[in-house]
Amino acid sequence: MVKRLSHLLVPLIAIILGLAAGALIMLVSGYSVASGYSALWNGIFGEIYYVGETIRQITPYILSGLAVAFAFRTGLFNIGVEGQLLVGWTAAVWVGTAFDGPAYIHLPLALITAAAAGGLWGFIPGILKARFYVHEVIVTIMMNYIALHMTNYIISNVLTDHQDKTGKIHESASLRSPFLEQITDYSRLHLGIIVALLAAVIMWFIINKSTKGFELRAVGFNQHASQYAGMSVRKNIMTSMLISGAFAGLAGAMEGLGTFEYAAVKGAFTGVGFDGIAVALLGGNTAVGVVLAACLLGGLKIGALNMPIESGVPSEVVDIVIAIIILFVASSYAIRFVMGKLKKKGAN
């Protein structure tokens, strides 16, 4: 119970310290802390449109966070979520633009294709790790760049005739919901949030309730003991990266089938995959934690857009707040050390 409480307190303390640091930066820079954070709040909850946009931003964050968290829980570091997301995005749009058909066939097929593409892209570093002991961090980082340039080539040379972006996907493959758009003052909120929450339930079930999840966690904790117990270390490493990549591919589908409904040539990474690392760390690599952390980061990202408009505070202040929060979460040992000292002092 005490350990679980500690896991909850560390992120909360990190959030408070991050917000305090943001307030200090605003004060030093000559801005009003009250108006700055008021603008941030209004940018999230001030209008129903902003609420819709916040939930829309949360959706890919949940899935990219799950991708990172799943790998972390099984002893692997998937830094290639950004690349897997781009591959999934392109694959989903390819299916979405290739043909028209019944929505109950077309949309699931596009989602499955995105998950399969992301999973395959994650499987490559998985098999290199399992068979040739190549460290997954190096491979996944390099594969991000391969994915960026490969998907750009496919968009401009395969999906289009030397165009910078594809046409709009068919309505039968779209995650857009007229009902959700209408009730949120025509924001870009779409049905992807349901997919993301279902994915969180699936991760929770696999990790905590299935035999395969126990094997994956055991291999991540101690490969030698797992092999001695009869588990296939190689198979579990590849399976873990496959599932992690599938979550990332779905994150790309949320953008391709929901937010934008097309794929475009990109000059740089989207950042959603890298933000997934922050989401996973802040969420303690648990399914519920990832959902909550995605809500926080998604809210901060959308709310920050309103800060320069309403209060004149640069939106970059929120980037600093997020960075400090992650810094404190990553250095959670220091927070636990201080908490332990305070507890001992209180006992005396």
From Swiss-Prot:
Localization terms from the record: Cell membrane
Pfam families: BPD_transp_2 (PF02653)
Name recorded for this polypeptide: Guanosine ABC transporter permease protein NupP
Family stated for the protein in its record: Belongs to the binding-protein-dependent transport system permease family.
Induction: Transcriptionally regulated by CodY.
Keyword presence, Nucleotide-binding: no
GO cellular component: plasma membrane
Stretches that traverse the bilayer: 8-28, 61-81, 85-105, 107-127, 136-156, 189-209, 237-257, 277-297, 320-340
Alphabetized PANTHER family for the sequence: ABC TRANSPORTER, PERMEASE PROTEIN (PTHR47089), GUANOSINE ABC TRANSPORTER PERMEASE PROTEIN NUPP (PTHR47089:SF1)
InterPro entries noted in UniProt: ABC_transp_permease, RhesusRHD
GO molecular function: transmembrane transporter activity
Disulfides per UniProt: none
Entry keyword annotation includes Transmembrane helix: yes
Complexes and interactors: The complex is composed of two ATP-binding proteins (NupO), two transmembrane proteins (NupP and NupQ) and a solute-binding protein (NupN).
Species in which this protein is naturally found: Bacillus subtilis (strain 168)
Keywords noted in UniProt: Cell membrane, Membrane, Transmembrane, Transmembrane helix, Transport
Record lineage: Bacteria, Bacillati, Bacillota, Bacilli, Bacillales
Topology class, membrane: Multi-pass membrane protein
